Regions:
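FabD-like malonyl-/acyl-CoA
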Residues: 1-141, 146, 192, 269-287, ...
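Non-catalytic positions within long, well-ordered alpha-helices that form the structural scaffold/packing
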Residues: 77, 182, 263-266
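NAD(P)-dependent dehydrogenase/reductase Rossmann-like domain
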Residues: 174, 213, 218, 266, ...
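Generic hydrophobic alpha-helical scaffold/packing signal
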Residues: 227, 246, 259-263, 280, ...
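A short, acidic, amphipathic alpha-helical segment used as a generic capping/interface helix at domain edges
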Residues: 250-267
Length: 312
């Protein structure tokens, strides 16, 4: 068996995520608390109760999701479950890099907290959005975006799986492109629960900020390969992690290509780490049964997974 860890991105977060894991697994609790110490707000309160209603704001979402991922990774590692490859959707790429030993948990959380603030700042003062477009291929959707560009910036920003693309940018342009997409044959258009036009050119200033921030980060060698969003595969010898993270925030996420590459590499099992089952769905729609995917969000799911892995 070749195993990949797949780390979820923004959009699946919800109040209460991780609370049962925190109570059930000491390793989760230790890693989560270590992560929480890297930010200047009560990360546990935001994750578990979100009384202030800020969890969906990207500067909070990102470190909270990263802390959740760190906790789950720690439990899996303690149980002897380690991956041959890792990848993460957008934000999840930082957790994949932490899992591969490129930087520690606190650095991952500090970076994603910084990234969240930089992305929020890049979107400040603009009315923006992102919408999933179902049932329309890339070429006709790109034509819709080109036509809608007179309303503002709109670009394809996520290539999730066959039949599911995401567009983002100025809300008026996104809405116009979605309307055109439906007329062109798209099955549905669904606005996403995110707070900015992520992975579009509107994030250019966030990319600049990340480039400067990464100058102070020591990137250790990977313990196993990570597949990068903006490439859809492992990094080349001429690539640097800092440059890829800078590019990632302002360019499309090549997730479908990433999943196909994992299958080419012989991966036949994957664990989705994070709330929700979005990545599991993308894997199934992309490579069918070639990769068995196990989503893990709750203590019960994790306990079942550990039993499954023990018997594998």
């Amino acid at each position: 068996m070749k195993l990949a860890f797949l780390y979820a991105g923004q959009g699946s977060q919800h109040a209460g995520m991780g609370q049962d894991l925190y109570e059930a697994f000491p390793a989760f609790r230790a890693a989560f608390d270590e992560a929480a110490a890297a930010v200047d707000f009560d990360l546990k309160e935001v994750c578990f109760t979100d009384a202030a209603g800020v969890l969906n704001e990207t500067q909070y979402t990102q470190p909270c999701m990263t802390a959740f991922a760190a906790g789950l990774t720690a439990v899996l590692r303690e149980a002897g479950v380690t991956p041959d490859y890792a990848a993460g959707l957008s934000l999840g790429e930082y957790s994949a890099l932490a899992c591969a030993g490129v930087f520690d948990v606190q650095t991952a959380v500090a970076l994603t907290a910084f990234r969240g603030k930089a992305m929020a700042a890049a979107a400040a003062g603009r009315t923006c959005g992102m919408t999933a477009v179902l049932g329309l291929d890339e070429a006709p959707l790109q034509a819709c975006c080109n036509t809608a560009a007179d309303e503002g910036v709109v670009q394809i920003c996520n290539y999730n799986c066959p039949g599911q693309l995401v567009i983002g940018g100025d809300k008026a342009a996104v809405d116009k492109a979605a309307e055109l997409a439906l007329a062109a044959g798209a099955r549905r258009c669904l606005p996403l629960n995110v707070s900015g036009p992520f992975h579009t050119s509107l994030m250019h200033s966030a990319g600049d900020a990340l480039r400067e921030k990464c100058k102070a980060v020591r990137f250790a060698p990977m313990q196993f390969p990570v597949l990068f969003n903006c490439l859809g595969h492992e990094m080349e010898e001429t690539d640097t992690i800092a440059a890829l993270l800078e590019k990632q925030v302002q360019s499309g996420v090549r997730w479908e290509v990433t999943v196909r590459r994992l299958a080419e590499l012989g991966v036949d099992a994957a664990i989705e780490i994070g709330p929700g089952r979005a990545l599991t769905g993308f894997v199934k729609k992309t490579v069918g049964s070639a990769i068995s995917c196990y989503p893990v969000e709750t203590a019960a799911q994790l306990q079942q997974l550990l039993r499954t892995m023990k018997g594998a």
